[in-house]
């Protein structure tokens, strides 16, 4: 197996393991997307790495209704060491080893996690033939960082003082993109909607898509994000990318946003999950304004 021989990794397998390090838990299909290898070929490689205890896994169990949870792989400490030595990066550049924040069992939230990671992988692969843009970094809520004495989702922040529950925001994911020609950087947040959240705002304290949009509006106006993400660039605004299950739900989300600030509609872009994961940087994105029928891109097309 030329992709993995002894302790030597091929460049493609290295890319796949780097994605495992970034995103903690990935399916065979997701590692294949990151590496560019065929899933049928990669599946055997991952099994070998798991037998050698470089990888661990969860899932691959039956679910209610007769369906089956996919098998998700993660790096063990020995796998991290193999990756570090294979790609020649110091730990300070690769990032320290972190075990996935997950128990040994499959949970319903995993479907949301996988859909979110699919979108981040679409960002990565979508830039492969766009050399004028560089992905600076990615964030996602399932990656924990230590703040004070507790571990928090790395995307968690507060839209304003005081730092109370009503002001807390936790984007599903985010990324920073740089235009290599201008040197300017853009900040993007991703919201992955699986169709389970109420669309319109209800009682105070209840969760809804419109309520989440309103929280992002406060985040935009308060500019606290500029300090939080200051280490990655100078940002005066951000763009929220809302990816949902169907075109019908997308249009209903736009209708539910009709009473929100019209001046902030351009900072919110919507698409379906299926289209987003396959054509992320193509002209697929609609404004939050239900009256606007135009599809736009997130970057300039030369």
Where are these regions (language model features)?
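Short secondary-structure capping/junction motifs at helix and strand boundaries
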Residues: 42, 57, 126-135
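Active-site metal-binding core of divalent-cation-utilizing nuclease and nuclease-like domains
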Residues: 108-110, 121, 129-189, 208-211
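Glycine-rich, often proline-containing surface loops adjacent to acidic residues and nearby aromatics
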Residues: 24-25, 93-102, 184-197, 236
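Non-catalytic C-terminal interaction segments of nucleic acid-processing enzymes
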Residues: 8, 17, 28, 198-209, ...
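A generic fold-level signal
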Residues: 11, 67-68, 114, 168-170, ...
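Core beta-strand-centered patch of the WYL/Sm-like small regulatory domain
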Residues: 113, 117, 121, 125-128, ...
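Short, flexible loop/turn elements at secondary-structure junctions
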Residues: 24, 35, 77, 142, ...
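Nuclease-adjacent, charged terminal/linker segments that flank catalytic cores
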Residues: 1-107, 113
């Amino acid at each position: 197996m030329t992709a993995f021989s002894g302790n030597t990794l091929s460049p493609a397998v290295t890319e796949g393991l780097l994605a495992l390090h970034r995103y903690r838990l990935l399916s065979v299909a997701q590692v294949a997307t990151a590496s560019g290898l065929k899933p049928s070929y990669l599946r055997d490689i991952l099994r070998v790495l798991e037998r050698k205890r470089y990888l661990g896994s969860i899932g691959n169990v039956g679910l209610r209704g007769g369906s089956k949870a996919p098998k998700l792989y993660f790096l063990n400490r020995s796998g991290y060491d193999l990756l570090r030595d294979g790609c020649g990066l110091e730990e300070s550049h690769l990032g320290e080893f972190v075990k996935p924040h997950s128990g040994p069992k499959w949970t319903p939230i995993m479907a949301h996690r996988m859909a979110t990671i699919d979108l981040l992988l679409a960002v990565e692969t979508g830039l492969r033939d766009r050399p004028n843009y560089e992905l600076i970094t990615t964030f996602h809520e399932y990656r924990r960082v230590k703040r004070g004495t507790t571990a928090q989702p790395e995307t968690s922040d507060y839209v304003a003082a005081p730092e109370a529950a009503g002001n807390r925001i936790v984007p599903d994911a985010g990324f920073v993109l740089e235009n290599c020609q201008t040197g300017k950087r853009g900040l993007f947040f991703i919201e992955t909607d699986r169709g389970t959240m109420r669309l319109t705002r209800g009682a105070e304290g209840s969760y809804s898509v419109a309520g989440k949009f309103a929280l992002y509006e406060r985040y935009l106006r308060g500019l606290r994000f500029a300090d939080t993400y200051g280490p990655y660039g100078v940002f005066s605004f951000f763009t929220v990318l809302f990816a949902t299950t169907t075109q019908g739900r997308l249009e209903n989300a736009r209708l539910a946003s009709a009473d929100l600030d019209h001046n902030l509609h351009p900072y919110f872009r919507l698409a379906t999950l299926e289209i987003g994961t396959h054509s992320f940087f193509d002209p697929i994105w609609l404004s939050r304004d239900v009256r606007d029928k135009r599809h736009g891109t997130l970057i300039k097309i030369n």
